[in-house]
Regions:
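Ferredoxin-like iron-sulfur electron-transfer modules
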Residues: 1-17, 30, 46-68, 311, ...
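A generic short-segment signal for beta-strand/edge and adjacent turn/coil regions
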Residues: 11-16, 34-35, 44, 219-220, ...
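Residues immediately within or flanking Cys/His clusters that coordinate Zn2+
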Residues: 12-18, 22, 63-73, 215, ...
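Iron-sulfur cluster-binding cysteine motifs and their immediate structural context
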Residues: 16, 20-42, 60, 65-92, ...
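A ubiquitous short alpha-helical element
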Residues: 26-31, 54, 108-110, 378
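Short coil/turn segments at secondary-structure boundaries
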Residues: 50-54, 60-67, 73-80, 84, ...
Length: 425
């Protein structure tokens, strides 16, 4: 009856209800609710599989009350792919009930008061408008918020993106290779300074940078919310855009986009379609420490006098198993005081922007607060992270407590170190 859930039966039976997930699951630690912990969610999905439970509103709320951070997956003693079970349950909900029926379960679209979540909803609304055709089901769900001005205050260059679509990011003489830059919606619309840093760093290191004009968002948000068809549409569009660009490598500075392109595209399109594309995709930190650049510690770098700490994005650390590359970049920069944060790998509750933009915003902030004491204990002036969604989440959490910190991507700090050392000012 529910074929998408049925596909997860082998994973479901691996769960022995041991309760180890209660130690690790951020939503459980923030709520102490059994339905919030992975064990409880698997029990509910199993009940649907056995015909003991329908796809009710309550079931849907429980399935969407998960950050999809993979913390439990990487700590499960029986290696249950918990995140896949939950994502498949969401996909079944979308297929069986439709997006319009789930709209008010996923999103709080009330307009009675000023809410921080309106920024997130307006961003996602813009993402839908920019990337999806008019007949896509998501278009019929709009508006998700009428607080456009909330977004305009967050959006630094909405009408003037950091890259001219259709142009090249930058020419260099005798380039090492031609690199395609996948920008991603969050960097394109919220943090264009990260995008400019990517282009500047790659040019300084003798790479030609191409920004394909027809690239769209990675599709991470849509696949995570259970819409496989839209995720597949976006995956095909991006694969085609970069194939036409004929690049040697594809880099992105948004770790959620890297995760989606490396793993999500295989899920929605299959290995045969994505094999060539996947072989070219790199998170920018991975690319810069992969040997294609050469040893960063041998590259002329000027001192950067900052005291920094590092928050590890779940998509990069748990999803892609790439904990080291960002820290290798920081370690290579002279003058930088890098203070390791206790619990750097702890989830911030953003869910790559997806969890924090829905009805779970308040819960996401409660999860983020676990990081507060650890951040403050470092006495760092700058928090470095490889995910723009983590940056927004943690900066909002700190601001709610009256604390302001500078946030930078590893590539921005590398840009500072290269500036001047390469004769670029």
């Amino acid at each position: 009856m529910y074929e998408l859930i049925n596909q997860m039966e082998d994973e479901i039976v691996k769960c022995v209800r041991c309760g180890v997930c209660r130690i690790h699951c951020p939503t459980f630690l923030a709520t102490n609710a059994e339905s919030a912990v992975s064990r409880g969610k698997i029990y509910l999905v199993d009940a649907v599989l056995k015909g003991e439970l329908e796809l009710t509103d309550e079931f849907a709320r429980d399935m969407y009350r998960c950050v999809n951070c993979r913390t439990v997956t990487v700590n499960c003693p029986t290696s249950v792919q918990v995140h896949n079970i939950i994502l498949q349950a969401r996909a079944q909900l979308v297929k069986s009930r439709g997006l319009s029926d789930l709209r008010d379960i996923i999103f709080d679209t009330s307009t009675n008061s000023e809410r921080p979540v309106d920024k997130r909803l307006a961003f996602f609304q813009e993402e839908i408008s920019r990337n999806l055709p008019s007949d896509n089901p998501w278009q019929s769900l709009l508006p998700l918020t009428d607080k456009k001005r909330e977004f305009s205050s967050l959006l630094k260059e909405l009408e003037n993106p950091p890259f001219i679509k259709g142009g090249k990011g930058g020419f260099v003489d005798n380039p090492k290779m031609k690199v395609g830059y996948f920008v991603g919606s969050a960097i394109d619309m919220m943090y264009p300074e990260i995008g400019r840093a990517v282009v500047n760093v790659l040019k300084a290191l003798d790479f030609e940078v191409i920004v394909p004009p027809d690239q769209k968002c990675s599709g991470y948000s849509f696949r995570t919310l259970g819409d496989i068809d839209t995720a597949a549409y976006l995956a095909r569009a991006n694969i085609e855009a970069f194939a036409e660009a004929d690049v040697d490598a594809i880099v992105t500075a948004d770790s959620s986009c890297a995760l989606e392109m490396k793993q999500g595209y295989v899920e929605v399109l299959g290995e045969k379609v994505t094999e060539e594309f996947n072989g070219k995709v790199y998170d920018i930190s991975e690319f810069l420490t992969s040997g294609k650049v050469g040893a960063l510690n041998l590259t002329p770098l000027r001192q950067v006098s900052k005291k920094v700490t590092y928050h590890e994005a779940c998509a990069l650390g748990k999803g892609l198993k790439m904990s080291d590359p960002p820290k290798e970049i920081l370690d290579a920069i002279p003058g930088l005081e890098f203070v390791e944060m206790d619990g750097a790998e702890l989830c911030c509750g953003s869910g790559c922007g997806v969890f924090a933009m829905g009805r779970n915003y308040d819960l996401s902030m409660k999860i983020a607060e676990r990081k507060f004491d650890n951040i403050m204990a470092t006495e760092a002036d700058v928090v470095v992270t490889s995910c723009p969604h983590c940056q927004l989440q943690l900066s909002e959490m700190l601001a709610s407590k009256g604390v302001e910190k500078e946030f930078l991507h590893p590539v921005q700090i590398l840009e500072m170190a290269l500036r001047g050392a390469t004769g670029d000012g």
